[in-house]
């Protein structure tokens, strides 16, 4: 990863969950081991304050992927639309 607040969903990595080819494919301060697995300390479960660095996995929302009841269920600076979908720009690289 790129530091304790770096947000990356390792489950979606091209080589499979927690598999990596570089540090950017590992969450938080984790690094990619020589055997191709993410290792070390991931980000804190708390997504932090809402804004461009806010990290939230919309795929796990109760109403379904990208569905929301409030903006805290949307990644980065995205907001929840009146129709219940996350909209706008996510704040981190997506897998």
Curated annotation (Swiss-Prot):
Residues 51-89 are annotated as: SD2. Disulfide bonds join 7-55, 20-32, 26-38, 68-80, 74-86. The keyword Membrane does not apply. Pfam families: SVN. InterPro entries: SVN-like_dom (IPR049004). It comes from the Bacteria. One of its GO terms (biological process) is regulation of defense response to virus. Residues 3-41 are annotated as: SD1. One of its GO terms (molecular function) is polysaccharide binding. Keywords: Antiviral protein, Disulfide bond, Lectin. Has strong anti-HIV activity against T-tropic strains of HIV-1 and weaker activity against M-tropic strains of HIV-1. Inhibits HIV-1 fusion and infection of CD4 LTR beta-gal cells in vitro. Inhibits fusion of HIV infected CEM-SS cells with uninfected CEM-SS cells, and fusion of HIV-1 Env expressing HL2/3 cells with CD4 LTR beta-gal cells. Binds to HIV gp120, HIV gp160 and to a lesser extent HIV gp41. Binding to HIV gp120 is glycosylation dependent. This is Scytovirin.
């Amino acid at each position: 990863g790129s530091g304790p607040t770096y947000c990356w969903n390792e489950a979606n990595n091209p080589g499979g969950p927690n598999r990596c080819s570089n540090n950017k494919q590992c969450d938080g301060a984790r690094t990619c081991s020589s055997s191709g697995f993410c290792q070390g300390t991931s980000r804190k479960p708390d997504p932090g304050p809402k804004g461009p660095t806010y990290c939230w996995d919309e795929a796990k929302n109760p109403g379904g992927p990208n569905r929301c009841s409030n903006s805290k269920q949307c990644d980065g600076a995205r907001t929840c639309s009146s129709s219940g979908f996350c909209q706008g720009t996510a704040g981190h690289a997506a897998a």
